[in-house]
A protein has these predicted regions:
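Membrane-interface alpha-helices at helix entry/exit sites of multi-pass transporters
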Residues: 62-65, 82-84, 97-110, 265-275
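Predominantly cytoplasmic-facing regulatory/coupling regions of multi-pass membrane proteins
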Residues: 1-69, 127, 131-241, 264, ...
C-alpha cells in the first residue's frame, strides 16, 4: 500500500482519470496476446523444472510441475516470498520428492533467472549507456533540480527499500545454503540435457519480455515510448517486483519513474506499468486458482 500511496502523491485526480481511460481503451487483442505470452512463460518454467527433478533422480507430473508455478505466484500476491515455500511443498508432497531437494532445485532456478536478468541489465547498459546518461544529465532533469526533488526522493526510497530487502535475505541465504548446493548439483547432472534447459530458460524471458513489448501497442498513446526504452523499462520492472506482493503498486511506479527520466509523462508510464502488471496478475490469479483446486484432486486420485 505504501507504493500505492506514492503513486497517488505523484499523480493528480485528472491524471488518474486519464490513466483509467487509457487502460479502458486498451485493444483486447493485444491484451490477450500479452496474457498468453505471460502464461507461456510460466508453463515453460514448470516444464523446465522437470529437467532438474530428473537430474536428481525423480520423475514429476507435468500438470503438477506447471500448476505449482502458478500457485507460487498466487501465494506471493497474498504473502510476499511465500511462493517458493508453497511450490516446494507442493512438488515434494505430490511428486514424492524430499522437500530439501525441491528447495534446492527451486534455488537453482532462481540463480539461473537472476543470472539471466543481470546479463540483460548489463547488455542494456552497454548498448544504451549514452542514452541513459544523457537523459539524467540533460537540461530537463538536473538543471531543474528543484522541480524534480520529489522524483529524486521517491527514487531514493525505492533504492533504500531494495537495499533493506537484500540485507533481510542474507540470513535466509545462509539457511538455504545446503539446498542451493543441492540445486547446483542438479544443474551439473543435466549433462546432455543442459542445452535444452538453457533454451527453455531463454524462452521464459523472451516470453516475459514479448508480453511487456506487446502491451505497448494496446493503447495508442503509448506509441510515444521509444522502442529502445522498452527493454530497460522491462528490467526495471523485473527488479522492482520483489519489493512488494508480486510487484503490486511498485511495478507500475518503478516503470513510470524510469520513463519519466526520458521525458515520458507520468500517466503514460503508469498506464504501461499497470497494463503489463495486470495482464500477468490476471493470468496468475486464474490459473493459480484453478491449480489450487485441481492439484489436490489429482493428488487424491493418484
Amino acid at each position: 500500500m505504501f507504493f500505492i500511496y506514492l503513486t497517488l502523491r505523484v499523480t493528480s485526480e485528472n491524471e488518474r482519470v486519464l490513466i483509467w481511460n487509457y487502460i479502458k481503451s486498451a485493444q483486447i487483442e493485444y491484451v490477450i496476446a500479452a496474457m498468453s505470452l505471460g502464461a507461456c512463460a510460466d508453463i515453460i518454467r514448470g516444464l523446465r523444472w522437470q529437467f532438474l527433478s530428473k537430474a536428481i533422480g525423480y520423475d514429476s507430473n507435468t500438470i503438477i510441475s506447471v500448476g505449482s508455478v502458478f500457485m507460487c505466484y498466487t501465494s506471493n500476491m497474498a504473502i510476499p516470498r511465500s511462493g517458493e515455500l508453497v511450490r516446494a511443498s507442493i512438488l515434494s508432497e505430490y511428486n514424492r520428492i524430499p522437500i530439501g531437494k525441491t528447495f534446492g532445485t527451486i534455488a537453482a532456478e532462481r540463480i539461473v533467472d537472476i543470472t539471466i536478468s543481470l546479463f540483460i541489465l548489463i547488455l542494456v547498459w552497454l548498448l544504451q549507456y549514452e542514452v541513459i546518461l544523457k537523459s539524467f544529465f540533460d537540461d530537463k532533469f538536473l538543471n531543474d533540480l528543484d522541480q524534480n526533488i520529489g522524483l529524486i526522493l521517491m527514487i531514493s526510497i525505492l533504492i533504500v527499500c531494495l537495499i533493506i530487502f537484500t540485507i533481510s535475505k542474507i540470513e535466509k541465504i545462509k539457511i538455504f545454503f545446503k539446498g542451493i548446493l543441492e540445486g547446483f548439483l542438479s544443474l551439473t547432472n543435466l549433462k546432455n540435457k543442459l542445452p535444452v534447459f538453457i533454451i527453455l530458460s531463454s524462452l521464459i524471458w523472451i516470453c516475459y519480455f514479448s508480453a511487456f513489448f506487446v502491451i505497448k501497442f494496446s493503447v495508442a498513446e503509448l506509441d510515444i515510448i521509444n522502442n529502445s526504452l522498452i527493454l530497460p523499462a522491462f528490467i526495471v520492472g523485473v527488479f522492482s517486483i520483489s519489493l512488494s506482493n508480486h510487484g503490486f503498486g511498485v511495478y507500475p511506479l518503478a516503470i513510470s519513474l524510469f520513463l519519466l527520466g526520458f521525458g515520458i509523462d507520468t500517466e503514460i508510464g503508469l498506464t504501461l506499468g499497470w497494463l503489463a502488471w495486470s495482464c500477468q496478475a490476471i493470468i496468475t490469479l486464474v490459473f493459480g486458482g484453478l491449480s489450487f483446486f485441481v492439484l489436490p484432486l489429482l493428488n487424491r486420485n493418484g
